Amino acid sequence: MVGAQLGLETVVSAIFDGSGDYAKTDHEAKFQIHRTFEGLLQQLLSLKWTEPSLIVIHGHYLDSLGLYLRHYPDVVASVVNKLFELLTSLPITIQGPSNNSRQARLQICSSFIRISRAADKALLPHMKNIADTMAYLQGEGRLLRAEHDHLCEAFLIMASSSGNRKSWPGYLNLLTKHGPKWNGKLHTCLTHLA
């Protein structure tokens, strides 16, 4: 399954990498490509795996479609919701002999980072919902510090993709509920981005 995921990532990159070839593709071919990837995405969204190692692979398949999401932002909300569903389906394990769930949870948070980089501006309209979900999970004690930090890093990548420095304070305000430690980090990061 891992080999197929790498193959998918290669195909998605070859088609949607921004080289301009896809933009020049005729409408009918674009429609067929979109339908193919949309069908694949629907299959991925409908999966209900519960084993941590399979959830990691599931997350990798979803983040392989990041460049596709850049061109078809109407499906971004479904992917974001699925990633949060995968994250919360795994138990929080702070200590114990098995840290498979903890590693899988971190990998799902890393998928947010990879999708943020690849999907570019497609995630901007979803930032408030992402921040609200992060705050909710944090408030419920269902988000570990390392997971929170990964998600905040993804959030910063999303904010920087806007390219509009004037909008960064608004993005910063979305995360102010995440505590003074992150507020300082966000101010520092946004200053460096400016």
Language model features by range: what are they?
Residues 1-194:
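Karyopherin-beta/Importin-beta family HEAT-repeat alpha-solenoid scaffold
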